[in-house]
Design a protein with these regions (language model features):
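Acidic/histidine-enriched ion/cofactor-binding microenvironments in catalytic or ligand-binding pockets
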Residues: 48-78, 155-205
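Conserved small/polar residues in nucleotide/adenosyl-binding loops
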Residues: 214-218
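Active/binding-pocket-proximal capping segment
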Residues: 127-129, 146-149, 195-201
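C-terminal active-site-proximal or functional interface alpha/beta core segments in diverse enzymes
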Residues: 49, 94-101, 107, 111-112, ...
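Acidic/polar loop patches that form or flank catalytic/metal-binding clefts of enzymes
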Residues: 33-34, 111-125, 137-143, 179-180, ...
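Hydrophobic, small-residue-rich alpha-helical packing segments that form membrane-like cores
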Residues: 2-7, 11-60, 66-109, 124-127, ...
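Composition- and surface-driven signal marking solvent-exposed, interaction-prone regions
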Residues: 55, 81-86, 145, 190-197, ...
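Short, basic/aromatic beta-hairpin or loop at an interaction surface
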Residues: 35-48, 143-159
């Protein structure tokens, strides 16, 4: 991100060249084994396409005044990652700032949740999503998914979704890794998503029976 903000407006940068540069920096990291999925590099209105994939036909230059979203990940000896960041290139409008604040609030609310053992992702999803619902907004994807080590980066059966699927979601267990990735997508304008990986950790037992309070750790 430092490289991007330092060079935007000074040299030509496109969605594809930005993605290549960021992937190249990752490849220089110790114990890097390879990308964990195809990167998403989305500028401006392309950010509103949840699974946008830049190619030679859709590729556009990055300029100041809009948002840029990058969703990338890598496989390492120590684990696999899936991380999304959205950054402002120069000054952006008030609506983009307001939407970014909503997404950040939602992501942090879920990341700091403490819950009783036995809860599934379906019990917790609304903790993040309520921030949007109060503003008449929503996003049409899960708030998080399980992460596979050197396998599928989207790995079940755990997830954060407000609606139960055909099979009941299992309880979150200690040491499970799950993503936290709320977003806002405004067609023709912008998209914002922030994504971290969370580790499920036990905390304390109390008088409410043979269960432990559990919390998520970013």
């Amino acid at each position: 991100m430092y490289w991007l903000k330092k060079n935007i407006g000074r040299v030509e940068i496109t969605e594809l060249s930005a993605s290549a540069r960021l992937e190249g920096l990752r490849a220089e990291q110790e114990h890097f084994l390879g990308p964990s999925f195809g990167p998403i590099s989305a500028y401006g209105e392309h950010g509103a396409i949840v699974h946008y994939s830049a190619d030679e036909k859709s590729n556009v230059p990055l300029k100041e005044g809009k948002l840029f979203m990058t969703d990338t990940g890598g496989h390492y000896l120590e684990g696999s990652t899936d991380i999304t960041r959205t950054v402002a290139l120069g000054e952006v409008g008030n609506i983009e700032k307001e939407h970014f604040t909503l997404v950040a609030r939602a992501m942090l609310r879920l990341a700091n949740t403490v819950f009783l053992y036995g809860c599934s992702g379906a019990n917790l999803d609304c903790i993040a999503r309520e921030v949007f619902w109060k503003e008449g907004l929503n996003f049409n994807h899960g708030t998080g998914h399980g992460v596979g080590y050197l396998l599928n980066i989207h790995e079940g059966p755990i997830n954060f979704r407000w609606k139960e699927g055909e099979r009941p979601a299992p309880a979150l267990e200690e040491n499970m890794v799950i993503t936290d990735e709320p977003g806002i997508y405004i067609e023709g304008s912008h998209g914002i998503r922030l994504e971290n990986e969370l580790l499920v950790r036990k905390t304390v037992k109390n008088e409410y029976g043979p269960v432990s309070y559990t919390h998520l750790r970013a």
